[in-house]
Structure formats: C-alpha cells, structure tokens
Amino acid sequence: MRSSIHASRLRKMGQSIPASTGPMARSANRFLQNRAAIFGLVLLTPLLFAVLTYPLWLPYKPNDIDLMAMNSAPSWKHWFGTDGVGRDVFARTMEGGRISLLVAVSSVVLSTAIGFLIGAISALGGRWADAIAMRSVDLAMTLPPVIFLLVLASIIGSGIWSTVVVIALLSWPVLSRMIRARLLELREREFVMASRGMGAGLGHLLFRHGLPNSIDILVVYATLQVANAILLEAGLSFLGLGVPPPAASWSNMLNAARSTAVLEQFPWQWLFPGGALVLAVLAINFIGDGLRDAFDPRAELN
C-alpha cells in the first residue's frame, strides 16, 4: 500500500520510478565504466578491421615476390617495407594477424569445450565420474607445460590445425577446475535436485543448468586465453614447431627475422609484426580484465 502511494506521488511530481536492471545489464554497465577495457577495445577494433578487410583494399598479396624491391625500407609503395625476397611486410603482417588470431580463437574454442565438459561431468556426473575426471586434470597439470608442448608438437607435427590441437590440449585443465567448483555449488540447489528427481539425464543437467550458470566463467576465460594462445603459438613458431613458412603468422615472421643482420639493418621486418602481436595481446588482456571485473559477484555487494 505504502509503495503504491509513494509511486503515485512520484508520478505526480514528474519523477520517474527507477527500473530494476538484471545482472547482465549491471555487468555491461560495469564493463563500459572500465577505462582500461574501453582502451583495449579502441586498440583492438581497428586492428581487427584491418586484418579482416586488407584483401579488399591492399594491392599486394602476402606471398607476392618482387626481386627488384628486396629489403626495401618503408615507403609510400610498401608501407612497412619488404623482406629478404621482396614480399610486402604490411600484407604479411595483416595475413599473419589472420592466422595468429585463427589459431588462437580455434584453440580457445576447443579448450573451452573440453574444459567445460570435463568440469561439468565431474561435478554433475556422480562420484566415479568426479574421481576419473579430476585424476585426469591432476595428471595434465603435473606435466611440465613447456616440455609437454614440445613433445606434443613433435608428435602431431607442424601446421595450423596441429598448432590449434597442441595449444588446446595444454590449456583446458584450469577451466575444468573452475567449472567444477561452480557446478558443485549449483548441484545442491533445489531446481537441480528437482530435475534429478524427475529423471533428468546428464545431458539435460549439463546444457540446461550447467552451461547457462557458467557463461560468465567461460566468457572471461576465453577472452584471456586468446591472448595466452597467441603467445603460445608465437613460442611454437619461434622454435619452428608452429605455423610453417611460407604461411605468414606474426611469430614465424619474427622467427624469420632473428638473424643479426636483419635485426640491425632491416628492423622493419620484425618491428611491425612484433608491435602488432604486442598490441593485440595487450588489448585482449585489457578486455579480459574488464570482463572479469564486470562479472565479479563481489561487485554486486558494492
């Protein structure tokens, strides 16, 4: 009664009644107030636009060879200069961004799927499923990551999709533990217990209850893991186990320019792809930190 009287008084005074907002709207508002996250978006958006659209407006292809312009410095004709066989460094930097981001995003999608399924099955599948899943996670986390990465890469081989598989197999255990912790709390709630009592199967529990209640973890993990995957691909390609030439990626462009002569005499061959890699990783980390703060449940208490 008092609330209706108060609302009618507000209407008479011409004041609007504040509408309640949902958790997603509040998270979006917190993200938009994060200056570092917005700065990351400002950095990443033009880079993504250039990487995705460069074939439409750039006259050079990544593997076009011009023997008359080998090791040319940056100019109006070749904005980032050329490499040792006359290939346009700007075109290769844009193509390298495509391949590096393709490897990173694909590996993150695969590792996110593996991590969610194992963590959710561990939490919702019963005692034996929990024991088996967690022992596999413990085994994966005890392996030295660098040695594990090199052994997997040498077994599977080099190539774009081989690199995707290698990075994904290294990245899923942390996510599975996070998902398990979230869903162990969820499975004791009334609506999940009611679903179990009505005979709901594991698939229903995973995708009807587990997935919607893990979206915040998945979004934050995937965003931050993209930056980590770019760096892992860079390490593999720098060691000759990632994306093989002549395909361009930021990391194998750096690998091709690591000789002393190139480092000292032709710095544009490593400066531009290295700068693009650093900017992309920095921007994605800023965005990931912003998403993590936006989805932080402790922010609801402030």
Curated annotation (Swiss-Prot):
One BP term from GO: peptide transport
Protein's cellular compartments: Cell inner membrane
Sorted UniProt keywords: Cell inner membrane, Cell membrane, Membrane, Peptide transport, Protein transport, Transmembrane, Transmembrane helix, Transport
Function in brief: Probably part of an ABC transporter complex that could be involved in peptide import. Probably responsible for the translocation of the substrate across the membrane.
Topology of the protein relative to the lipid bilayer: Multi-pass membrane protein
Quaternary structure (record): The complex is composed of two ATP-binding proteins (BAB2_0817 and BAB2_0818), two transmembrane proteins (BAB2_0815) and a solute-binding protein (BAB2_0812).
Annotated region (Disordered), positions in chain: 1-22
Protein name, as recorded: Putative peptide permease protein BAB2_0815
Spans through the membrane: 38-58, 101-121, 147-167, 230-250, 268-288
One CC-aspect GO term: plasma membrane
CDD domains membership: TM_PBP2 (cd06261)
Organism: Brucella abortus (strain 2308)
Source superkingdom: Bacteria
Family per record: Belongs to the binding-protein-dependent transport system permease family.
Domain (ABC transmembrane type-1): residue spans on this chain: 97-288
Record's keyword annotation contains Transmembrane: yes
